[in-house]
Amino acid sequence: MAARSAPSCHLRLEWVYGYRGHQCRNNLYYTAAKEIVYFVAGVGVVYSPREHRQKFYRGHSDDIISLALHPERVLVATGQVGKEPYICVWDSYTVQTVSVLKDVHTHGIACLAFDLDGQRLVSVGLDSKNAVCVWDWKRGKMLSMAPGHTDRIFDISWDLYQPNKLVSCGVKHIKFWSLCGNALTPKRGVFGKTGDLQTILCLACARDELTYSGALNGDIYVWKGINLIRTIQGAHTAGIFSMNACEEGFATGGRDGCIRLWDLTFKPITVIDLRETEQGYKGLSVRSVCWRGDHILVGTQDSEIFEIVVHERNKPFLIMQGHCEGELWALAVHPTKPLAVTGSDDRSVRIWSLVDHALIARCNMDEPIRCAAVNADGVHLALGMKDGSLTVLRVRDMTEVVHIKDRKEAIHELKYSPDGTYLAVGCNDSSVDIYGVAQRYKKVGECVGSLSFITHLDWSSDSKYLQTNDGSGKRLLYKMPGGKEVTSKEEVKGMHWASWTCVAGLEVNGIWPKYSDINDINSVDGNYVGQVLVTADDYGVVKLFRYPCLRKGAKFRKYIGHSAHVTNVRWSHDYQWVISIGGADHSVFQWKFIPERKLKDALHIAPQESLTESNSDESDSDLSDVPELDSEIEQETQLTYHRQVYKEDLPQLKEQCKEKQKSATSKRRERAPGNSIRLHFIHGYRGYDCRSNLFYTQIGEIVYHVAAVGVIYNRQQNTQRFYLGHDDDILCLAIHPLKDYVATGQVGRDPSIHVWDTETIKPLSILKGYHQYGICAVDFSADGKRLASVGIDDSHTIVLWDWKKGEKLSVARGSKDKIFVVKMNPYVPDKLITAGIKHMKFWRRAGGGLIGRKGYVGTLGKNDTMMCAVYGWTEEMAFSGTSTGDVCIWRDVFLVKTVKAHDGPVFSMHALEKGFVTGGKDGVVALWDDSFERCLKTYAIKRADLAPGSKGLLLEDNPSIRAISLGHGHILVGTKNGEILEVDKSGPVTLLVQGHMEGEVWGLATHPYLPICATVSDDKTLRIWDLSPSHCMLAVRKLKKGGRCCCFSPDGKALAVGLNDGSFLMANADTLEDLVSFHHRKDVISDIQFSPGSGKYLAVASHDSFVDIYNVTSSKRVGVCKGATSYITHIDWDSRGKLLQVNTGAKEQLFFEAPRGKKQTIPSVEVEKISWATWTSVLGLCCEGIWPIIGEVTDVTASCLTSDKMVLATGDDLGFVKLFRYPAKGKFGKFKKYVAHSTHVTNVRWTYDDSMLVTLGGADMSLMVWTSEVERHREKKNCDSEESDTDSEEDGGYDSDVTRENEISYTIRALSTNIRPMFGVKPHLQQKEPSVDERQGVVRGSRPPVSRAPPQPEKLQSNNVGKKKRPIEDLVLELAFGYRGRDCRNNVHYLNDGDDIIYHTASVGILHNVATGTQSFYQEHNDDILCLTVNQHPKFINIVATGQVGDSADMSATAPSVHIWDAVNKQTLSILRCSHSKGVCSVSFSATGKLLLSVGLDPEHTVTIWRWQEGAKIASRGGHNQRIFVAEFRPDSDTQFVSVGIKHVKFWTLAGRALLSKKGLLSTLEDARMQTMLAVAFGANNLTFTGTISGDVCVWKDHILCRVVARAHNGPVFAMYTTLRDGLIVTGGKERPSKEGGAVKLWDQELRRCRAFRLETGQVTDCVRSVCRGKGKILVGTRNSEIIEVGEKNAACNILVNGHVDGPIWGLATHPSRDFFLSAAEDGTVRLWDIADKKMLNKVNLGHAARTVCYSPEGDMVAIGMKNGEFIILLVSSLKIWGKKRDRRCAIHDIRFSPDSRYLAVGSSENSVDFYDLTLGPTLNRISYCKDIPSFVIQMDFSADSRHLQVSSGCYKRHVYEVPSGKHLVDHAAIDRITWATWTSILGDEVMGIWSRHAEKADVTCACVSHSGISLVTGDDFGMVKLYDFPCPEKFAKHKRFLGHSPHVTNIRFTSGDRHVVSAGGDDCSVFVWKCVHTPH
C-alpha cells in the first residue's frame, strides 16, 4: 500500500539562476540590509552579495511582473499575472507575507508604487481599461479605483512632495492624478508645442510640481504641473526604460545600454556605457537601475544583474546571469562533477557550478538549442538543435568535435549509452538515430516505430536496449544499435534501465492522475538510490513521488516557483540536488534534496508557508489506508444545501413575472385579511448536521437555532423568543464572549451572517458579499471584535470580519474538503484554526489574505477527519476531536499526541477553566483535566436518568451528541435527534426542547376539541404534541416505516396514519397502540381523512393516483375513486360526508361521491355553494389567488381554512406561510406573509378553535406554533411581516409636476447631442474655398510689407477706437441668475446664521449673500447638480454635499458623484463616485455629520451610506423599484433613516454594513392607502411625517401609520423641513393663493397647529420645492425659480433670486452702452437684468414662448421674435408696444436692427430673412426678403455700413445678402472686404478654429466677437463656454474652456466695453455673467 503514499523526503529551494529582465522595468532594488531584491518566474529573490546567499519569497501562484520597495526598504510589494492576480506585500528579511491584496484586478498587475510614508500602495492592472487602484495595504482594503487609460501604462509614482497626487505614464500619454474621497481624477499632460506626443516609459517626481519622465525616443521630458516645460534631448539614444530617484539625484537607464547619473536639478553628472565594459556586448539593454550611495545596480534585458561602484565605473561586477529571452529546454548533468549544463533558444549553452552557484562557462552556438547530453566520462557534450542539426563539443574548452545535420526538424532528446559507445538522438519527425561515438559519430542505426515526435529516451544498463516515449504517449523499446522493435514480454521483463526519464511506462503510472489522458508532464527523472522520482509539468510544479510508482493517482509532494511550463528536470550525479528549468521564465532552479533520515532532525522544514502551499490538498500526503468515514459524517458531507430558487432571486423573478401579471391584475385585487399570526413556539432543534450550536446566555436563557429562526428559550417559563431576520436555513451559531450577542450564518446564493442581540432581538450587523451557497461555521474572537466564518462553496472560503463595521478584513480559500469548524486564537487575534475532512489547518492573517499551514502529523498518526477544535492555555496549544474518537493535541502546527476519548466521532468540545468537556456519537459527555491526561467523569444520556420535570420523552438511549455548552452546575447537550437536554453535574438529565429527527415531516393533524396535535415523519416516528403552555411532546411511537399523513377521528379517540409503503394504520389516540392496519397500495399514502360527523368513513389517498374509502366500523374497503391522472395531494370531505374533493399532482381538482367513489363533474359555480367540512385544497376558483406571481418556480403545498371560513392559511415551497381572505378569488390575491421555515412548508392546520395555526417544515423538521391575532384585539405591537403584499393600487392622485419629475431622464454632458436639428457637413470637414490670396497665387506671408494695393479692411468695426486693444485672457464667473427648482427639492439652505444662502443651478453651487447679492461659486462638478444638503453638526460647520448626474459604466470621471465641500472657501473635502447609474437624486448627512446617505436614479434606486471623510462606502442596497424622491437621516441618529417616493415610504436601519428596511404599515387606520410620498420630516419619540401627493401629511410612529393630517395643503406637499433647535416643522406645497391658505406653513412639533404664509409672487399657483427655517425667517425655493425669504413675524416676502422658469433661453441681447442685458425664453417672458445691481429689473409676460431679442443701436427700442412667427417692437422707456407683425408661421430665430437704425431683419425657421423699413412707421410692411437660403436661419449680422447681411443656416452654410434688395452675394473678393458691425456667426473661415474634433453629435451653438474685435467667445452643446482669439482660421484652435452650464449654451454676448460676457443656458434656464480679465498693458 505504501506505493501510493507520498514520499517522506523533501526538496528545499537553494538557488535560482536568472533575473526577469524581459517585459519588466524597475524591478531591482537594494533593501535596508544592503541585500538585493528582484524576482524571477514566480519567486521573489533576496540576494545577499556578502554571503552569496539567496532567500526566496514564494507566496505567488504565477509569474511576478512588478515590484515596488517600501520607503523604509524592508517591505516589498510584488504583483503577478493570472486570471485572479494578487499583490503580496512581504518582508525581505524574513520572506514572510505581511499582506495580500486581491479580488480587484484581472489579467495581471503591471505597476506598483508606495506613497511617501508607505501607508498606501497604488497598482495598475493589465485589463483593457488598465485600472488604477489605491490600497490601504495593511488592511488589505481598496480605497479607490478608476480606469487608467485606453492603452498600456508603463510606470506610476506617487508625488512625494504633494499629498494625494500621483503620476502615471504609458503609450502616448502621461496623466496627473489627484485622489479625493474615493475618486481618482486624472488630468492629461499637455505636450503642447514643447515636445512631440509620444510614449513615456518611466518617471520620477521632484519638488515644485516638477516631474521628470523618460520617453521612447531617448529624450527626458520635464513637466511642471500638467504642462511640458522643456525636454532634455538625446539623454539616451534610444528608449529610457528606467529612472530611479535617490538622495543624490537621478539615475536613468535605457535601451542604448547606458546608465546616466543626474543631479537633483537634472544636470548631467556622468555616463556609464555598459556595452563598452569587458562584460558588455552589442545590444545590451538596461531595464532597471537603482542608485544608492556609491553603488549602482543594473538589470538588463538579457537577465544579468551588474553592480557598479561609482568611483570604478568602468569595472561593473556581474552578480547574476541567466538565460536570455527564448524558450529553455535543454538540461544535462555532468556524470562525475557537480555541474549542470543548460541550452536555450537564446543559442547559448551554459555550464553552472552547483557548489559555487555560479556560471562557469558559456558558449554561443548558431542555432537554438533544444536538448543536451554529456557522455559517461564527461568529455563530450552533445547538443541537439532546433533546426535538426547535432553538435558535439569538448566540455573542457567548448571546442567543436563534430557537426551533423541529418534531420530537418528539431532534435528533442539525445542520450549517450552507459558504456559510451553510442549516442541516441530523438527528433520531431518521430525518428531516433543512433550514432557510433568512436567512429566520429557515424550513423549506425535508426528506430522508426513511432508515429509521433520523440519526447524522451532511456538506455538499458547494458546499453543493449533503448526505450522511447513519443507525443502520443506511446512507449516503445528497441534493440541496439540496429533499431529493431522489441515486443516480446519475456525480453522486456529482464531489462534494467540505466536512467528513467520517460513519462510513460509501468514504473511511472502513478505520476498521472487517475482519470486523465492528458499530456502535461514534460519531464521526469528517477533516483534509484533514494527511491524517489521527480516530475515537471506544464503548471510550474515540481513534484516528488515514490519510485517505482505503479498505481495511478499516487500521492506526492509538490513545489512551486516556476511560473508556467517546467520543461526539464534532472538529479545531479550524486543525487544531492534536483535541477529544474522553466520554459518561458528561462530560469534554472536548484533544489536541495533532503532524504528521509535527515527529516527526523529537520522539523523546521515542516509545511512551508504559502498561499498555495506545497503540501497542498491534492498532494494528499496521507497514507492511503484512511479509515472509512463514520456513517453520520458521511451523510453530512453529502448534504449540498443548494436551492433551485434562492430568496435573493425572488425580486428578479417577480419582476419577470410581473409582465405576465399586468393583464391579470386589471381587476381590483382582494385586500389582505385583517387577522395576523405571531410565532409562539417551535418544536425542533437542528442537530443532525450542525455542531456546537447551542449556548447559555448570561441570564441563563438558552440560544440555538432551527429552520430559519434563532431561538431564545427561557427554561423557567418554558417560553421562546425568536430572531426572524434570516430568510433561509441557519447552519451555524456562535455566541459573543462578553455580551449576549449571537452570530448566525444561513444558506443563500450570497449568504449572510447576522449578529444580533438576544435581549432586544434586534440585528446589530449583517455581513454578506463574500460567501456562496451558505455559511457552515462562525466564531467570535476573544475580545469579541472580530468574527471568522467559513462558507460551503467548493473552496470553503474563510472570511475574517470586523463585524461591528460590517467590514471584511481578510479572505482565503480554506480547503477543497469540507470544513466543520473554525476557531479564533484567544491570545493572538490574527490567528485561527480550521478543521474538517482529513485536515487541520493553522492560519494567520496577512492584510486582506490569510496564510494557512497544514497541521504536521509526522510519524504520530495520519491526517484524520477533525470534527471539532479548541485552543488551550497558551497560544501554541490546540486540541481537536477526530472522527475516530481521538483527541489530538497540537503544539504550533505539530501533532504532539493523541488520546482516545469516545467510541465514534468526537462532535463537540469546550475548554473550561480547569479542563475540557467532550461529547461524541456514543452519547457520552466526558469531563477531562487540563492536559487531557485523565477523564474525570462521564455522563451517559439515558432514559433512566431523565428527571421528572422533563418536557418530553427521550427517543433512544445514548443519542449522538452534537453540541455541548456549560452553565453553572449544568451541562447543556444537543443531540442529533433534535433534543436539547440539561445534564446536572450530579447526574439527572432534564429534557427541555425536542423535535423530529432527520427526514422530511409531512403528516400533521390537530385534535377535534383539545389543544394537541399529531405529527408523523420520515424519521419513522408518530408523535403527539401539547400545544397548551406546557409545550411538550406527550407521546411518541416508532413505526416500521416513515409516514406522510395522519388524521384524528371526529371523536378524537382514534388516529389514522398513512405510511410510505402504501399501508396505513389506525391507532388509539391516547396510547398510540395499533387498532387496525391495511396494506392495499404500493406507493406513499399522501392524505388521509375521516368523514365528518360520526367518522363513519375513512378516505385514504395514495401516490398510486387512487383514493380508497373504508368503512371504519366494519374495517372494510367499500369504494375506490379512480380517474386521477397523477398522484393525489389533498382530499377534503363535504360537511354531509357524501362528497370528496381531490387535488392531484397534475393540478386537477376532481370530485367523487362516497362511499362508492363515483366520479362527479361539478361546474365551478356550484362548487362554491357546497359546504366543505375542511378545506385543505390548493386548487379551484375559491383559492385561485393563493398562487403567487412566481408560480412557475414554487408550489403552494398546503392550505387550511379557519372554521369561520374567513381566513385561508397556506404554505409553499419557499418556506412562506401566508394568510389570505377567503374566498381568494382572482389572480395574485393580497396576503400577509411570514418567514420562519426555511424551505418547503409541508402542512398547515388551524386548531379546533382557530386560536393557533400549526405549520410543519419539510426539510427543517420543525413544528411551529403560531397564535392568531384578530384585528380588533390587537395591541399596537404589529406583527405583520415585512414582505406582506398589502399595498394599495392607488397612489393618491395625479400631479403634473410629480409625473414629470418621475419620468425625466437625465443625460450626461458627455452624451449630449444637438439642440438644433442641424444637417450637412460640419465646417471643419468641408472642402475649403481658396482665399483671395490663394486664388491670386500669393504664397502666404510672402506679400511685400509695403504694397500699392489698398490695405484689407478690418473684419469688424471696432467700437472702442482710441483705446489700446487689450486681448481678454480669462473669464471669471461673477453672477448666475437661475435656480434649479423645477425637479429638485430641499436644495436652498441658510448658512452663517442666515447671512448667506446656498443653492445650485446647472453644475455650480452658489453661495449668495442676502444683503449684498454678491455670489461665489463652487465649480468642481463636471455635470448637473441634482441635490444639495448642509451638514448640521457644529463640528462640520458650512460643510455642503452636492450630488450630480453621471453615467457609471466605469468609475471614471463621468460617474455620478457626490462632492462634499466647504461653502466658505470652496475647498473640496471629498468626492464620492457612486455606482448609481444616471445620477444622485438625494443626499443627507447623519446626526454626527460623519455619514452621508445618497440615493441613485438607477432602476433599483440604490441607497448608499458613506463614511465621507474617508471616501468609504459602508453599505448599499436597492431602495425601491420606483423613484425615490428623498431619503433623510433621523436628526438624532446615525443608523436610522427614512426614504419616500412613488407609492413608497421605508424605514431603514444601518446594521454593520447591511441596510434593513421596513415598509410603512397602514393597517391600523381605516381606509388608509399608500400614496406617493414627496417629503419627510421628523419629530421626537420616533415620529416621522411624510408629505403626500394629495396634500395630506402622514404621521408615523416607528413604521406604523398612526394618523393623517388631511389636506395640510391643497396640492402635493413637495418640501418639509425639521428645525433642530425647537422641533417646529415647515411644509411647502403646491396651491393657489387663497385668504386662509398658503403654500408655506409652519407647524408645531406634533403637526397639530399651523400658521400659513402666502408668497406674494403674483402667480396663479404657487409651487414650493424647498423650505428651510432660520432665525425668524423661512427660506422658500419655488418651481418658478424664485428664492423668497418670508418673515415669520410679519409674513413679509422678499424675493432674493429670480430666474427663468423654463428654457431654453434662446434670446439674449446686451445694451449698447449700459451694463444691462435682456433675455428671452420658452417661458414666455423677456427679462431685463442689471449686472451692477446684481438683480432682475423687470420682466414682460408675452403669453408665448420668445426666441430672440435685440436692442436698437441707440438702445431705445427692443425687438422680440416669437416662437409662433410673430415679432414685437417695444419702446424701452415705457415698455409699450410700438409695433407688431406676424408674416411667418414658424419660429423667428434671430432679429436684428441695422447699424443705421433704418432696417429690421427678421430670420425665421422658414428658411427666410424678411426686411422691414422702420422709417415707414409702426405698420411694419415687409419691403423685401432673402430667398434661396438652404435651411433655417440661425444667426444674422449686419455690415458696418448696413448694406450687407451675413446669415448662418442649419446646414452649416454661411451666405451674404445685399440689404435691402435681398440679393445673394457670391463674389468672395467682395465678401472678404466687408467690415461687419457685429459677428455672431458660428460659420465662416474666420471662425473655422472653433469647431472641435469631438463634435460628431454636438455642435457649437453660438458665438460672439468682442467689441474690440480680437476676442471671440462660443457656447456649445456640451455646455462649455470657450474663449478664442479672433480671427481663428486654423482648425482646432487653442482656447480656454469654462464649465458651469448644463448641456447646451444657447446664446452668448459681450456687454458694452467688453467688461462682461453673458451666456444663456438651454437645459438649465440660467443666465451666467462672466467678468472679462484683460491682459495687462
From Swiss-Prot:
Gene Ontology CC entries for this record: cytoplasm; microtubule
Keywords assigned: Cytoplasm, Cytoskeleton, Microtubule, Repeat, WD repeat
GO terms assigned for molecular function: microtubule binding
Keyword Repeat among record annotations: yes
Main subcellular location: cytoplasm
Tissue expression notes: Highly expressed in brain, especially in hippocampus, cerebellum and olfactory bulb (at protein level).
Keyword Repeat: yes
Stretches for region Disordered: 609-629, 1274-1299, 1323-1363
PROSITE patterns recorded: WD_REPEATS_1 (PS00678), WD_REPEATS_2 (PS50082), WD_REPEATS_REGION (PS50294)
Leader sequence residues: none
Compositional bias (Acidic residues): 615-629, 1281-1294
WD repeat copies, ranges: 59-100, 104-145, 148-187, 195-233, 235-273, 280-321, 323-362, 364-403, 406-445, 449-488, 561-601, 725-766, 770-811, 814-853, 861-900, 901-940, 996-1035, 1038-1077, 1080-1120, 1236-1276, 1420-1471, 1475-1516, 1519-1558, 1568-1606, 1608-1654, 1699-1739, 1741-1782, 1783-1822, 1895-1934, 1940-1977
Subcellular location(s) per record: Cytoplasm, Cytoskeleton
Bias type Basic and acidic residues, positions: 1326-1337
UniProt similarity note: Belongs to the WD repeat EMAP family.
Biological function: May modify the assembly dynamics of microtubules, such that microtubules are slightly longer, but more dynamic.
Name this polypeptide is given: Echinoderm microtubule-associated protein-like 5
Source species: Rattus norvegicus (Rat)
